[in-house]
């Protein structure tokens, strides 16, 4: 079986997969932090902007954009968790 690099081996390098899991976790945390920053900025706008356009803007953030950030962060965290779990299983299998 060939992998993306063209070599023909099967298995996993758990060190690399665990490193990738940490990167994915960090990206999830960065997205969450960015989402929280945008949430704060949106809240501050509500103090300086009133009316229908302001309400529409806030509703669009809360109903459309924020859920996308939440989903992206969750998916990255799930990928991180799966990668870390698979690396742990590989270590157990290889050492057993």
Report residues per predicted region:
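N-terminal secretion-targeting helices of virulence/extracellular proteins
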Residues: 1-96
């Amino acid at each position: 079986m060939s992998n993306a690099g063209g070599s023909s081996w099967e298995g996993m390098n758990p060190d690399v997969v665990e490193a990738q899991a940490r990167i994915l976790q960090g990206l999830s945390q960065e997205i969450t932090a960015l989402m929280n920053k945008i949430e704060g900025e949106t809240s501050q706008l509500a103090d300086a902007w009133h009316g229908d356009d302001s309400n529409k803007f806030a509703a669009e953030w809360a109903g459309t954009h924020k859920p996308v950030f939440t989903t992206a962060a969750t998916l990255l965290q799930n990928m991180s968790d799966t990668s870390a779990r698979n690396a742990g299983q590989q270590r157990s299998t290889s050492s057993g």
